[in-house]
Every structure is written in structure tokens, then in C-alpha cells.
Amino acid sequence: MICLKILRFYQKFLSPLKPAACRYYPSCSEYALWQFQKKNFFLAFLSTFFRILRCNPFFKGGFDYPKVSKNFYPMNLCFKPMFLAKKQLCFLYIPYKNKSFYLIKIIFKRTNQ
């Protein structure tokens, strides 16, 4: 998706040129990246737009994780465990309301032991 490429370009080349000033965690660009990865274009655009509007001196700031809606289905009890889950796990879904979850990204690197 072109939006993801534009956001990654901004994070890699433009964002380092200015001081870190985002009032929220995750930063507005990271928030937008997560939204575009997990929602359709229209909803991601609206969520990002309102987040950028909130990122100003009149708002307190703090933690503002993206909220996503997702249906989880019961897994089959006969499955093979994945021993390399750390390598494949990218996001955690923390329950918020009925079928709404906070989206939290896993940011660790696998170390060789």
C-alpha cells in the first residue's frame, strides 16, 4: 500500500530532521502506520487525522494506542505449538470493549542464545 511506503519514508528521512515533539506514545507516524496495517484505508485515515488534530499543546498527551475491532474465533484444540512465536508475533490485542481491542506492537529483537 502506498500509504505505508509514504509513512516509512517520512519516518526514515524526514522525521529525524526535526526534534521529537509528539505528545503521545506511540508517535503520530507510528500510530498511523499501525492503523493503515490493521484497518481499511478510510477508517485508518480518519483515525490518523483525528490523532494529528489532538497532538497539540491544548491536549495532555500520554499513551494513546490504536483501537481496532476484530472477531476472534475459537482455535482447534489439536494444533502444533509454534516454538518460533517471537519471530512471528507482531501485535498484541488487549481487550477494550466488546469486540474492540487496543493494538500494542511488540518491539523486541530476537537474540541468539
Curated annotation (Swiss-Prot):
Keywords: Cell inner membrane, Cell membrane, Membrane. GO terms for cellular component: plasma membrane. It is a peripheral membrane protein. InterPro entries: Membr_insert_effic_factor_YidD. Pfam families: YidD. The keyword Phosphoprotein does not apply. It is found in: Cell inner membrane. Belongs to the UPF0161 family. Could be involved in insertion of integral membrane proteins into the membrane. This is Putative membrane protein insertion efficiency factor.
